């Protein structure tokens, strides 16, 4: 746990580095934070922050730059930030000026978000949330070969062949399918994965088959996202190296962004922040990702996000992503004739 003085110094380092993109010297910290202490005390605090992993110093005589841990500490202090009222009014006005069509809203969302954060903004088309189990059927084909038939809500049918260790009769398969129907009917893949159930080896094989089929269906539903602001990101000092430019271009060319920005959990209106090594995808572990879902739970859900270097304007990004996800949720609810899930203040 940092002392109040160490917190002030860390926030000063993060703010200055985000703004200037150069290592922050002790004299700059002293001038910025307004503490009634000497330079030697600042240097001692900086050494302690480095030892505890909050900052990095390329050389002992050089200034400080935030580590992922330092950015995380800083972000945790920004959870309740909001856009200024005038900015909210302007955004609402812009959305009222465009046609009431989803693609118009998505294009406007990434344009507004990228301009505000000066980085690349991404938004996915709202789609049906994870498929839900309607019915499970097991059919004996021969010996230990079994056909798993999965019917999802909306009458989508998936099938897969599996092998049991031993021969199982059709009546035994019916008992297994009845038990799994009782346990899993109406559940999503994520809920099935999280549900604790004492299953025998054959039932576990069926469960694994169900999860595999549902994962394939969920991924098939994904569409390539809308994005804007690549030019803002490439103007950042971090992208003066050709290798970094090639990395981000490959992500776009290989169409991997949809999976990378999809939160690995059920619908959540909160803003999620993944900094550097916190990212699940190895390709973006030198970046920060700020995402939020929008839409109608269990019906139509999309994702809004910002991706950029870890030296990101987190305060602007958090407030903008949060508000735009709320605006889009309201618009999607109106489009579907549903009550909005939040208040558009």
UniProtKB/Swiss-Prot annotation:
Note the InterPro entries from the entry: GAF-like_dom_sf, HrcA, HrcA_C, WH-like_DNA-bd_sf, WH_DNA-bd_sf, WHTH_transcript_rep_HrcA_IDD
Q: Do the record's keywords include Cell cycle?
A: no
Q: What are the alphabetically sorted keywords of the record?
A: Repressor, Stress response, Transcription, Transcription regulation
Q: Which Pfam families match?
A: HrcA
GO terms (molecular function) for this protein are: DNA binding
GO biological process per UniProt: negative regulation of DNA-templated transcription
The family classification in the record reads: Belongs to the HrcA family.
What's its job?
A: Negative regulator of class I heat shock genes (grpE-dnaK-dnaJ and groELS operons). Prevents heat-shock induction of these operons.
Q: What is this protein called?
A: Heat-inducible transcription repressor HrcA
Q: Which organism is it from?
A: Dehalococcoides mccartyi (strain ATCC BAA-2266 / KCTC 15142 / 195) (Dehalococcoides ethenogenes (strain 195))
